[in-house]
């Protein structure tokens, strides 16, 4: 299933949740490295997205991005937000509240172009569980909620 950022998706099944937790656990256990790798892959594949991060200005190579404390800090925040979503799969109201709050911050305070949520979600899905429909469904749920303030 391709990742979507509008509309709705079916709830996750118990089997999908189990598979997501299993795929996510090793990624989160090395979240500092995994998060940076994901964010660097996102910026190298979508350089225009970097303009929404003023602190990353002038970081033009993957090596510069990996060494940046600001990149590492933001990568950790992204990984922790996904981890919160994984942890909240059984409480979608809790997940929704957190992600709607995050949407508001990105829309109003940071003025991020929402098209990039889906692009980043695809990088995360490819890294964690390439081609897994359940993980892509979770990423779709996240993207739909992140667009809610736009």
UniProtKB/Swiss-Prot annotation:
- SUPFAM superfamilies in the cross-refs: Globin-like
Q: Which domain of life is it from?
A: Eukaryota
The yes or no answer to whether the keyword Zinc-finger is present is no
Q: Which residues form the Globin domain?
A: 11-150
Q: Which residues bind heme b?
A: 74, 106
Name the keywords, alphabetized.
Heme, Iron, Metal-binding, Oxygen transport, Transport
TM helices/strands, residue ranges: none
Q: Which GO terms describe its molecular function?
A: heme binding; iron ion binding; oxidoreductase activity; oxygen binding; oxygen carrier activity
Alphabetical list of Pfam families matching this protein: Globin (PF00042)
Relate the assembly described in the record.
Monomer at high oxygen tension and high pH and dimeric at low oxygen tension and lower pH.
In its miscellaneous comment, the UniProt entry states: Globin V is the major component of the 6 globins found in the Sea lamprey.
Per the record, the similarity remark reads: Belongs to the globin family.
- Name of the protein described by the UniProt record: Globin-5
Q: Which organism is it from?
A: Petromyzon marinus
């Amino acid at each position: 299933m391709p990742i979507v950022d509008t509309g709705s998706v079916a709830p996750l099944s118990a089997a999908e949740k189990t598979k997501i937790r299993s795929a996510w656990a090793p990624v989160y256990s090395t979240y500092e490295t995994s998060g940076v790798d994901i964010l660097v892959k996102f910026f190298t594949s979508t350089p225009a997205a970097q303009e929404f991060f003023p602190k990353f200005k002038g970081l033009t190579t993957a090596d510069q991005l990996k060494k940046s404390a600001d990149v590492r800090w933001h990568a950790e925040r992204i990984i922790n937000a996904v981890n919160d979503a994984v942890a909240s799969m059984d409480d979608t109201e809790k997940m929704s509240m957190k992600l709607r709050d995050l949407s508001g911050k990105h829309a109003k305070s940071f003025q991020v172009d929402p098209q990039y949520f889906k692009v980043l979600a695809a990088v995360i899905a490819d890294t964690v569980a390439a081609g897994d429909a359940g993980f892509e469904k979770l990423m779709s749920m996240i993207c739909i909620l992140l667009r809610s303030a736009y």
